[in-house]
Amino acid sequence: MKRSTLADRYCSIARSSSELMDAWSFVILRELFLANMRFDGLQAQTGMSPRSLTLRLADLAESGIIKRVAYQQSPARYEYRLTSKGKELWPVVIALKQWGDKWSGPWSDDQPPLTLHHKDHDHQLELGFICKTCGEPVDAHSTEGTMSPAMTAEREQTASDYQQAIRSKRQGGA
């Protein structure tokens, strides 16, 4: 399925993936969360070519995840700041970091590359999911999803279209 098609699906995972599913986007977000907001700093830390970085920054700005803010007039220079929409990606980025700490090592000094500390507390931070209603920890095994009627209808149509394509291919190939 094409990435542009994902943006049209009636699914929040598909739509958000169409905006973000690019490894470079997450590396840029990491840098912005680390307060590295200027083009030169982003290029230095990501290793991206100027053209690739420019394109990714434009995509993130078009999606409303970042905004470009002038910090110098002559010559014009900009920094890139997370919008409210972008700041709400923090738990997503940290969940990806924690997954990478566990599954993308081993690390040369037996420590993850970045540790987070809870400000004003004397401990490392580890992201977890807590139900806001009851306060209990939750995971994939303690939750279940309920699809909306619109999502159910789209999935049924997608399955039907797929089966029709298979039948057509078989009939044409016979």
List where the protein language model places each region:
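Short aromatic/hydrophobic contact patches that present stacked aromatics
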Residues: Q45, E79-R81, T115
